[in-house]
């Protein structure tokens, strides 16, 4: 049985070499209904959200039940498919909040010569098993940045996406069963499994990322997206804000810094 390490500030992730293989990207994007040929040999940056979480799992930090709240996806130099990269990372802080532990992690991906390609700082919530386990009273996961999108009526809708459970099952990997196990998701308080944050961001990178370009996105996961939701992909007229929405509700939003 896996012996997990309780997260603590200063914990360094195991440094490993990896690459995003063309066959892997094709398999996962096809599962989501995205044509992998669109990327023309570039890695879809949305993959680095899941890969950075997996780096923690591989280092002994459980992701089971954790909720991704904020991810910054900064592409300094876009990697190509099958390009070798070294992953490094560190837990910067662990803070007690009413709902559990708020964990700040920074993961970077470098070339074999040390050039930083992508950095992925992340804020996640590790919920307590039950309310009485929480180290602080009340509810909440700590401070929340102000919204990027004031109203979904401000968005220019680019496309509609009808999500299907088989898409999430085909995309997800083991590590956090709330994404693929109905019983676990319901036990966590969700009516159905919720998609991982990275899955939703694939719809945004497909619509708005300039192939091979630098970018700096601050991604806020505001509300859960269920694996059978109907969502819309949109942006502000100035392209400084992107979003996945459902009706009048913003589900995931992005502050585009560059």
Regions found by a protein language model. Give the residues of each.
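A conserved acidic, glycine/proline-rich C-terminal tail/linker
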Residues: 204-233
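Small beta-barrel nucleic-acid-binding modules, principally OB-folds
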Residues: 63-78, 213-222
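Hot-dog-fold acyl-thioester-processing enzymes
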Residues: 1-70, 136-142, 146-212
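HotDog/MaoC-like acyl-thioester-processing domains
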Residues: 2-7, 70-160, 224-227, 232-258
């Amino acid at each position: 049985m896996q012996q997990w390490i309780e997260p603590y500030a200063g914990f360094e992730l195991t440094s490993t070499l990896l690459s995003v293989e063309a066959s892997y990207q094709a398999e996962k994007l096809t599962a989501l209904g995205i044509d992998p040929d669109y990327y023309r040999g570039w890695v879809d940056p949305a993959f680095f959200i899941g890969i950075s979480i997996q780096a923690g799992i591989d280092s002994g930090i459980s992701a089971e039940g954790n909720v991704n709240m904020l991810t910054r996806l900064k592409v300094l130099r876009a990697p190509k498919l099958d390009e070798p990269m070294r992953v490094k990372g560190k837990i910067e802080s662990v803070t007690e909040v009413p709902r559990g532990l708020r964990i700040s992690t920074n993961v970077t991906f470098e070339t074999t010569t040390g050039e930083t390609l992508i950095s992925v700082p992340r804020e996640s919530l590790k919920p307590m098993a039950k309310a009485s386990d929480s180290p602080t009273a009340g509810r909440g996961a700590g401070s929340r940045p102000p919204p990027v999108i004031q109203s979904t009526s401000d968005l220019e809708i680019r496309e509609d996406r009808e999500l299907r459970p088989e898409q999430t099952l085909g995309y997800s990997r083991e590590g956090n069963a709330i994404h693929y196990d109905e019983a676990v998701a319901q036990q966590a308080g969700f009516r159905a499994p919720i998609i991982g944050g990275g899955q939703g961001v694939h719809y945004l990178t497909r619509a708005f990322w300039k192939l091979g370009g630098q970018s700096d996105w601050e991604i806020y996961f505001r509300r859960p997206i269920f694996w059978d939701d109907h969502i819309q992909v949109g942006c502000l007229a100035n392209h400084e804000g992107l979003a996945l929405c459902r009706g009048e509700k913003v589900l995931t939003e992005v502050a585009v810094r560059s």
